[in-house]
Design a protein with these regions (language model features):
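Bacterial N-terminal signal peptides
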Residues: 13-22
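Sequence-structural signature of mature extracellular/luminal beta-sheet repeat domains
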Residues: 3, 9, 13, 29-333
Length: 333
């Protein structure tokens, strides 16, 4: 079974060498087969437009501020976070993960991955440092606030989401390490989903998944995670810890697609990347929308004016969500 996040989206026979300094070639992108779901509507008013390009592997988009805000996103192997202000893209934080040079061969992805707003700043799943960190949006100073569980270092934190009470949930696969599951750097024997409290206590939510992306329902009572089986829902109790786990959407229900990053909208729908584009599932797990996007899609984020921003291989694209689509008139960002 392939464990590489990008292998989830790869068609049989494709071959890419991944790691710091590697590039995604146009030929490799062309190997992504087109995907369609007859009868499943496209939630967008039109197609998607490229707003930033020329990166290695984009991830972790998050909108910062209101109507006049900006988009932040990671270039994970490039070890940098970039900002798009509606007109141009500039470097926001480099390095965004591993702080040394040269980057050791033991690290496959040295930079930040998932990004989220919380604790009065920017929170990053730091694949290279193998930790969670807070970045002051004004000074850009980094502060690590979680890096181990029961004395053992995390694998390589991948994605995160912040609860209303300030707790941070995150996934910890080994994708950032050379050798992935076989990396000699691994100290934990499992790939977990964790919860970090506001006083930085780390609690294990589950060690029974091969997790990647993560999202919370609007009421914060359901935690969603991607897995090799598809998408999983974890019911949370009043303390924010698991009360049960169930299959939300099985991979074989959507043509064998497996997810990467995802977001929940204000109606409780889950917008998730997968083979061929963005999939939208209702809170009941019904497949209610699909946005076809060429190349490999890693994650998405909502912004003002109903725009959906998508990290897409070497670039970032965006499209406008139809107001009449379920939840479209009240998308939160």
């Amino acid at each position: 079974m392939e464990t590489d996040r990008r292998a989830f989206l790869r068609v049989a026979g494709s071959s890419l060498v991944l790691g710091a300094g590697s590039v995604w070639t146009a030929a490799a992108q062309a190997q992504a087969l087109p995907v369609s779901f007859p009868g499943i509507p496209n939630p967008l008013e039109g197609g998607v437009d490229v707003i930033a390009t020329g990166y290695i592997w984009t991830e972790g988009p998050v909108w910062v501020g209101g109507e006049d805000g900006h988009l932040l996103f990671s270039d994970v192997p490039g070890n940098a976070i970039y900002s798009w202000d509606g007109k141009r893209t500039t470097a926001f934080l480099a390095p965004s993960g591993y702080q040394g040079f040269p980057i050791p061969a033991s690290l496959r992805e040295a930079g930040s991955n998932g990004l989220a707003l919380g604790r009065g700043g920017l929170l990053i799943a730091d694949s290279g440092t193998r930790a969670l960190a807070r970045v002051d949006l004004a000074t850009r100073q980094r502060t690590v606030f979680a890096e181990s569980y029961q004395g053992k270092r995390f694998n390589s934190p991948n994605d995160l989401v912040v609860a209303r009470n300030g707790a941070v949930y995150f996934t910890d696969p080994p994708f950032g390490l050379a050798g992935v599951q076989n990396s000699p750097l691994r100290e934990l024997t499992f790939t977990g989903v964790f919860r970090v409290t506001t006083d930085n206590q780390v609690h294990l939510v589950t060690d029974k998944l091969s997790p990647n992306g993560i999202a919370l329902s609007p009421d914060n009572r359901i935690l969603y995670a991607t897995d090799t089986s598809g998408w999983v829902a974890i019911d949370l109790d009043a303390s924010g810890m698991p009360a049960g786990q169930r299959q939300f959407v099985a991979s074989d229900k959507v043509g064998g697609a497996r997810g990467d990053g995802m977001k929940a909208d204000s109606a409780g729908n889950i917008w998730t990347s997968g083979r061929g584009g963005i999939y939208v599932f209702s809170p009941k797990g019904e497949h209610i929308g699909f946005i076809p996007i060429a190349g490999r899609v890693s994650n998405c984020a909502f912004g003002p004016d109903r725009y959906l921003y998508v990290t897409n291989d070497t670039q970032v694209v965006r499209g406008r969500i139809r107001a009449e689509f379920p939840g479209g008139s009240a998308i939160r960002y």
